[in-house]
Design a protein with these regions (language model features):
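Glycan-recognition patch characteristic of GH18 chitinases/ENGases
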Residues: 1-44, 70
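Conserved beta-strand positions in the central sheet of alpha/beta enzyme cores
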Residues: 11-13, 47, 52-54, 126, ...
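Short loop/turn segments at strand-loop or loop-helix junctions that form parts
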Residues: 14-17, 55-58, 129
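Gly/Ser/Thr-rich helix-start
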Residues: 16-17, 51, 141, 181
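Serine-hydrolase-like catalytic core of hydrolytic proteins
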Residues: 35, 39-43, 50-52, 56-57, ...
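Substrate-binding surface in catalytic domains of secreted glycosidases
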Residues: 58-207
Length: 207
């Protein structure tokens, strides 16, 4: 929640890893309208001037959430309706009401996204440039800024993909993690990426 004394806007964040229910809410016109209406009411009640939508992820059941094939199109429809509502609030109050959207940085998560379409809807796009690995059987940097010979995925690659697809560079925010990944029972003695492992574990950095 950014605070006003710093010059930033208080933003309502909706979603996150394992936050279920968005696919269901966005699947019908009535559900989308109710989602947007309740969001705008909550924003007005608590003085929020922006909303961040963090659906992880449209079209996938990652995190144990429900999903459907139409999720991506429903996501755009939801964002479009929310954009209209925020613009009306801006016109009515004279205060800018912003929409930010979080997207994954991995190739498979970026593939269904149309950056130009997103550019027309969002004020900011937060690229979650982390968890690029850590869910398979090989070691790797889970938040690599640049790719190397062992791994193509990186924050820079995600940003380039979005820019080339039509998303304005000034709308992109690069998300970085405050945690690391540990590897258990790494095969061999060489400390390299892509070494075999038996499992992974997250490690939070203290404040």
């Amino acid at each position: 929640l950014p605070m006003e004394p710093s010059g930033s806007l208080p933003v309502l964040a909706i979603g996150g890893w394992g936050a279920d229910g968005v696919s269901q809410a966005a699947s019908t016109a009535d559900g989308r309208a109710r989602f947007v209406d309740s969001t705008l009411v909550l924003m007005e009640r608590h003085g929020f001037l922006g909303v961040d939508i963090d659906w992880e992820y449209p079209g996938t059941s990652a995190g144990g959430i429900k999903s459907r094939a139409e999720d991506v199109e429903n996501w755009y429809a939801l964002l479009s309706l929310l954009r209209d509502g925020l613009d009306k609030r801006t016109a009515a109050t004279g205060q800018k009401h912003t929409l930010s959207v979080a997207v994954g940085a991995g190739d498979s998560l970026l593939k269904p996204i149309d950056p130009a379409r997103l550019n027309a809807l969002a004020d900011q796009v937060v690229v979650m440039a982390y968890d690029l690995c850590g869910f398979d059987r090989e070691t790797g940097h889970h938040a690599a800024l640049y790719p190397d010979d062992n791994s193509r995925q990186s924050g820079a690659r995600a940003v380039r993909t979005l820019k080339q697809g039509g998303l304005s560079a000034d709308k992109i925010l690069l998300g970085i993690p405050a945690y690391g990944r540990m590897w258990r029972q790494v095969s061999g003695r060489a400390v390299t990426q892509t070494a075999g492992i038996s499992g992974t574990k997250g490690l939070n950095f203290p404040d």
